[in-house]
Design a protein with these regions (language model features):
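Extracytoplasmic/periplasmic proteins that interact with beta-lactams or build/remodel peptidoglycan
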Residues: 1-72, 91, 265-270, 386-392
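A short, polar/charged loop-to-alpha-helix boundary motif
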Residues: 89-102
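Active-site SXXK
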Residues: 57, 79, 100-132, 160, ...
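Active-site beta-strand/loop architecture of penicillin-binding DD-peptidases
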Residues: 214-256, 261-269, 293-384
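Active-site-adjacent helix/loop patches that line small-molecule binding or acyl-intermediate pockets
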Residues: 66-77, 113, 126-139, 147-204, ...
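Extracytoplasmic/secreted envelope proteins and their assembly/folding machinery
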Residues: 54-58, 97, 154-161, 166-170, ...
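Conserved active-site-proximal loop/helix segments of enzymes involved in bacterial cell-wall
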Residues: 132-161, 197-199, 238-297, 301-302, ...
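Short beta->alpha transition motifs characteristic of CBS
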Residues: 83-89
Length: 397
């Protein structure tokens, strides 16, 4: 076969696969198509999903039954999606559309992007101290003014990240960045960009802020216009875990001829550097503090100590009311990377629960359960290999 003919065949194959996958989304099918008709022949599609992991995720989603839930697990090293599950309580059914829909306000997850910009391009460090008034969960214009008050408090940037302080993020953005810079960093993280080749995943949206207050809103995630998909939420954590490199998410591993089994097409890994390594490492530390002492601490308090010592776990919470389907979103995006690098670069997990009238289970708790299952059943850590944390402890004694 000539080179041009081979190239045309690959393009045709990809186009047909994309068409079939999009049809699956259009009609809210429960599973991805495994076969596609290509001209006069049929091709097989293989996906990156881990069946055992997906079955476990479905089991825990049915146990807690939030009004809507989506759980994503991505392999940090390859960008392959190991699981992408959507669930709806009303019909007690799973679907494949919710994980890939970008109709969800990102809430405080966007603080990851803002932090990346501030750490890399300004004088802000995790130890920088900011003054604020009022509750950190609100964002009023008066809170952004530097007016002395007996009610004024001080908080480090590290603690502001761990406890998701909107006021400090708003003030830090106004003083240390611009709308253009934040827009560019959002683009680096994959906003306003096509993230996947096989699927017409709608773009996550970040709009340029026009005023200081809009900049504060966007930087803190305190708005309903910055939209994201659960897939993208997991990708954001993966960028941090990968020392600043974005591995574009993939779901198809190969397409082969149904008769000859010859591989017709397998997707190439696409990557881009988003952050310098030192910046990514600082962000890792901040996300780890969120899990240890911040807004996610309660969900990870009872993790098996041996497992915890073998992993570096970081995360970011977020909550906001709005989006489609409408409801109060409870977000958690996280990474779980083995301390022993022989076990690979680990996974990133995003959980989105949408609650209507009743709160059923925390997204951070579901993420913890997924991490525990993955490292016990799917990719067990070798108990005989002492971790770097244990080695450091031995040095101290």
């Amino acid at each position: 076969m000539k080179k041009e003919e081979r190239r045309e065949e690959i393009i045709t194959t990809r186009s047909l696969v994309k068409e079939n996958l999009n049809e699956a989304f259009k009609f809210s099918k429960k599973t991805f198509p495994k076969k596609v008709d290509l001209k006069e022949e049929q091709v097989d599609i293989k996906y990156s999903f881990n069946e055992d992991l997906t079955a476990y995720i479905k089991k825990i989603l049915k146990r807690y039954r939030s009004d809507y839930s989506s759980v994503i697990v991505i392999d940090n090293e390859t960008g392959y999606i190991l699981s992408a599950v959507g669930y709806e309580r009303k019909d007690n059914q799973f679907n494949i559309t919710l994980p890939f829909s970008s109709t969800h306000p990102s809430a405080s997850l966007f603080k990851i992007v803002t932090t990346a910009d501030l750490l890399e391009k300004s004088e802000v460090t995790k130890d920088s101290v900011f003054k604020f008034r009022g509750r950190g969960t609100t964002l009023y214009k008066y809170q952004l003014k530097d007016k002395k008050s007996r009610w004024q408090r001080r908080q480090s940037f590290e603690r502001a990240f761990a406890y998701s302080n909107n006021v400090i993020f708003g003030k830090a953005a106004i003083k240390n960045t611009t709308g253009e810079r934040l827009f560019d960093m959002a683009a680096d993280f994959g906003f306003n960009e096509k993230l996947m080749e096989e699927i017409s995943l709608s773009k996550s949206v970040f709009e340029m802020p026009d005023t200081d207050y809009e900049l504060a809103e966007k930087a803190s995630g305190f708005n309903k216009k910055t939209m994201i998909s659960p897939i993208h939420a997991a990708v954001m954590a993966s960028v941090v875990a990968n020392d600043g490199v974005l591995n574009y998410p993939r779901v198809v591993t190969e397409i082969s001829d149904n008769v000859t089994k010859k591989v017709i097409w397998s997707p190439q890994q696409r990557t881009k550097r988003v952050l310098e390594v030192p910046t990514a490492r600082e962000l890792q530390e901040l996300m780890e503090v969120t899990v240890k002492r911040g807004t996610a601490r309660g969900s990870f308090r009872r993790v098996n100590r041996k497992l915890l010592n073998g992993l570096e776990i970081g995360g970011k919470t977020g909550s906001i009311t709005g989006g489609i389907p409408f409801g109060k979103r409870d977000w958690f995006t996280s990474f779980a990377v083995p301390v022993n690098k022989n076990h690979g670069k680990g996974i990133s997990i995003a959980v989105m629960n949408i609650n209507l009238e009743k709160w059923y289970v925390k997204s951070s708790y579901l993420a913890r359960k997924v991490i525990e299952y993955y490292y016990k059943e799917v990719n067990p850590l070798n108990d005989n290999v002492s971790t770097a944390k244990e080695a450091e402890s031995d040095k101290d004694t």
